[in-house]
Amino acid sequence: GAVWGAIPGLLKAFRNLNEMIIGILLNYVALLFMGYLYAGPLMEANIPQTAAIEPADRLSRILPPTRVHAGILIALAVLILIYYYLYNTASGFRLRVVGNNPVAALVNGLPVKRMTVISFVASGAISGLGGAVEVLGVSYRLMGGFGAGFGFDGVAIALIGQLNPIGTGFVAYLFAVLRVGANTMQVGAGIPSAIVDVVQAIIIIFAVAAMGLV
């Protein structure tokens, strides 16, 4: 994750390319490369997926018989650490300055390019940690469709959460409830799970409008 995150970071810092576009394009490259792995050298028998992770290596469930596992604790810990770093440390303040106004940061002598790359590397590492939690706590293997839509959901969640770690956490929980609820409604009531995409789109439109971006 850190290595993958460094690519848009370097392109943003030294070529001033749009990190959003580069990130989206790299998502497709990563998905195709992952597909090569679980359908090629890591394939289990003749099924396009990797072998299942041993039960002893999986994240334990903390609220049996539900599927809630220790990954939620990891997510909360990362959320708190990021918030503390950004809003209670000098380097976190400098990083926010670079993100909000790189020109002003450069004028004041901050190493904008270096901090930009570091922030992308850290972001990629956290994304990789999220993927590891998903594998170790939910799917237990790599298979087709893994991670599909996560990147776009992440962009929407960060936007609605106004790039604040705490706000992002609450919005992520809301989106998770919508996703799980949609699957339950489809099984129990026959309501198409795609309805959640409509609901999320409406939420995003209103959130962006409230921020004055449209």
Show where each model-derived region lies:
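Helix-capping/transition residues at the boundaries of transmembrane alpha-helices
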Residues: 12-14, 86, 160
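Alpha-helical transmembrane segments of multi-pass membrane proteins, especially transporters
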Residues: 1, 19-27, 115-123, 145-149, ...
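Cytosolic-side transmembrane-helix boundaries in multi-pass membrane proteins
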Residues: 107-114, 180-214
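Helix-loop-helix "hairpin" substructures at the membrane interface of multi-pass membrane proteins
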Residues: 3, 65-141, 165-166, 170
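Transmembrane helix-bundle core of multi-pass membrane transporters
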Residues: 19, 23-88, 141, 195
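Hydrophobic alpha-helical segments embedded in the membrane of multi-pass proteins
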Residues: 2-6, 25-28, 76, 128, ...
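Transmembrane-helix boundary motif in ABC transporter permease subunits
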Residues: 1-17
